[in-house]
Amino acid sequence: MPELKSEYLFTITATVAQLHDVGAVPGGTRHVDLIGAGKFEGPRLKGELLPGGMDMKTLRADGSMVPNVRLVLRTDDGALIFMHYTGVRHGSPAVMARIAAGEVVSPTEYYLRNTPYFETAAPRYDWLNRIVAVGVGRRMPDHAAYDVFEIL
């Protein structure tokens, strides 16, 4: 059977500065989270999240959450990178309730994956424009973190 190969890119962490509960919409319940402070670091790039990012996530009737995130990253050498992703988080109702209550829950108890894409005009990071990546996430009471991998 063929094997899917990947290479670690970076770990990204972000806080939520403000949450807007839009309410019940046709696809579920819409929340718009304004992203606060954050950073990313890996072997080929590191830096910070710029203010103004947001997650326009949907909480679906089946209990899963679908993120819809837009961020601008600034590398430590000043390059700007637009990052956008969607994905899915799901787990048992009891585990999701613990996360919602702010409890620290092991990421082995739920599924949190995303598919980031990147856009940049910076020549040094141009390779990001042509890759597929996958993020494996965990939700902490005060931030979210994702380990991001390039699919080779």
What residues fall within each predicted segment?
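Beta-strand-enriched cores of mature, soluble protein domains
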Residues: M1-L152
